[in-house]
């Protein structure tokens, strides 16, 4: 497939979420170009479709891609998923995280705006910061922690991506949609960068201790990756979504200690739960969010869809692939 064939461009398309999105787009009959530097993604994530005649993989950074202008100009739509992610990476490599999430997004938005290509920009629930609201909606005020704690650099970088995207929408009429993803999980997610569910499942399958950081009372809502993909596709196909921000997440809430116990029970594991102080797991002064539950009424209103795959089913499907 040549670069000027009409296609959907997916940055980060060899990553966890991106690879599932690519499979869905191909199944829908779309031609797809993946632009990925494979820093966190991998060719293996695309092994099921690597020989597909409507798929092309371009390896490299967005900012270093000599074909970027052509790839964007001939695109029918762009999904910008490329980013530096994961708590471990954020804490250990803050410069890399900030540079990647800010610069690569700006380059992509410039190209998309020049050609007026409908674009979805993936943000994160991390932008809600330290707010203690029981559930977060898109219009809420955001409370970010201090810059001395590198964890908040990731949230700020993604929030700046949102500001950039909306600025391009306002000044250059870019048809853009921002999505705040809440703990997307499922097959192909790796625990290498601190992702909790694959880490728990891998340990439970070996009957090893499940290490819970802090007191385990922090709660999260876990969204199955195919539910996230369904929401992304529906938003891209909805002109009413453009210029807006949407939460994408499941509303079934569980503490991390509860998640560990649920994994043990679902897999019939002999593992035990082991609590580890944040200072031992990360750096002294590490901050965390106590709750992170989305309000998805806006998503449901615009797309007539809300993620509903149960946590038990998510654990089962994910465990089959680890």
Task: Describe each region flagged by the PLM.
Residues 21, 232-236, 260-263, 315-322:
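Hydrophobic "lid"/C-terminal helical patch
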Residues 6-7, 297-298, 310-322:
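Amphipathic terminal alpha-helices
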Residues 215, 245-246, 257-260, 268-291:
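C-terminal "lid/loop" region of Rossmann-like NAD(P)-dependent oxidoreductases
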Residues 132, 159, 174-175, 184-198, ...:
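Glycine/proline-rich active-site loop of Rossmann-fold NAD(P)-dependent oxidoreductases
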Residues 53, 138-145, 173, 200-212, ...:
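A short C-terminal helix-loop "cap" of Rossmann-like NAD(P)-dependent dehydrogenase/epimerase domains
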Residues 41, 63, 92, 100-103, ...:
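Residue-level signal for the nucleotide or nucleotide-sugar donor/cofactor binding architecture
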């Amino acid at each position: 497939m040549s670069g000027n064939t009409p296609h959907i461009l997916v940055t980060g398309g060899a990553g966890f979420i991106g690879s599932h999105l690519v499979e869905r787009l191909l199944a829908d009959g779309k031609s797809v170009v993946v632009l990925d530097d494979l820093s966190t993604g991998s060719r293996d994530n695309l092994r099921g479709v690597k020989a597909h005649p409507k798929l092309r993989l371009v390896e490299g950074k967005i900012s270093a891609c000599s074909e970027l202008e052509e790839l964007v100009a001939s695109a029918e739509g762009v999904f910008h998923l490329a980013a530096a992610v994961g708590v471990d990476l954020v804490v250990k490599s803050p410069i890399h995280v900030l540079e990647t999430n800010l610069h690569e997004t700006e380059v992509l938005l410039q190209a998309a705006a020049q050609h007026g290509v409908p674009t979805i920009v993936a943000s994160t629930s991390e932008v809600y910061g330290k707010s203690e609201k029981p559930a977060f909606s898109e219009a809420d005020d955001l409370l970010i922690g201090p810059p001395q704690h590198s964890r908040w650099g990731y949230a700020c970088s993604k929030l700046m991506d949102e500001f950039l995207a909306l600025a391009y929408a306002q000044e250059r009429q870019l048809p853009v949609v921002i999505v705040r993803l809440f703990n997307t999980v499922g097959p192909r997610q790796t625990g290498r960068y601190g992702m909790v569910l694959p880490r728990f499942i891998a340990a439970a399958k070996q009957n090893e201790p499940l290490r819970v950081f802090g007191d385990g009372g922090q709660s999260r809502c876990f969204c199955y990756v195919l539910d996230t993909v369904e929401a992304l596709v529906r938003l891209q196909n909805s002109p009413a979504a453009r210029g807006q921000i949407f939460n994408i997440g499941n509303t079934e809430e569980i503490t991390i200690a509860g998640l560990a116990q649920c994994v043990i029970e679902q897999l019939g594991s002999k593992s035990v739960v082991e609590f580890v102080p944040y200072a031992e797991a990360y750096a002294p002064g590490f901050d965390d969010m106590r709750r992170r539950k989305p309000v998805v009424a806006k998503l449901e209103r615009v797309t007539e869809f809300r993620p509903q795959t149960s946590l038990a089913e998510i654990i089962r499907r994910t465990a089959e692939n680890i």
